[in-house]
Amino acid sequence: MIRKAFVMAVNPDAHAEYQRRHTPIWPELESVLKAHGAHHYSIFLDETRNLLFGVVEIESEERWNAVAQTAECQRWWQHMADVMPSHPDNSPVSQALREVFYLE
């Protein structure tokens, strides 16, 4: 498995709404993520800095990157664009993080 981590932002007034929309995520999106090899996917909120930290284990970069091309993912991005900084295609502004420590 490949571990990935990334940081995004959430609008300061949208913490509760961001969490509400993920409780639970759409079943169709969950199916897409699992079908594309995503496992143990978590998102953590730093409320003081309005930052979201995502951590996911994936089976392959190619399959993970293909998630973005699915209708379900694009629909999800559109659904979330009003609560977080997003690109013109509605994908969230995201920065990959480099792993510096891991304990199994």
From Swiss-Prot:
The keyword Cytoplasm applies. The active site is at H22 (proton donor). Coiled coil: none annotated. Pathway: Carbohydrate metabolism; L-rhamnose metabolism. One of its GO terms (cellular component) is cytoplasm. One of its GO terms (molecular function) is racemase and epimerase activity, acting on carbohydrates and derivatives. It catalyses: alpha-L-rhamnose = beta-L-rhamnose. Involved in the anomeric conversion of L-rhamnose. This is L-rhamnose mutarotase. It comes from Yersinia pestis.
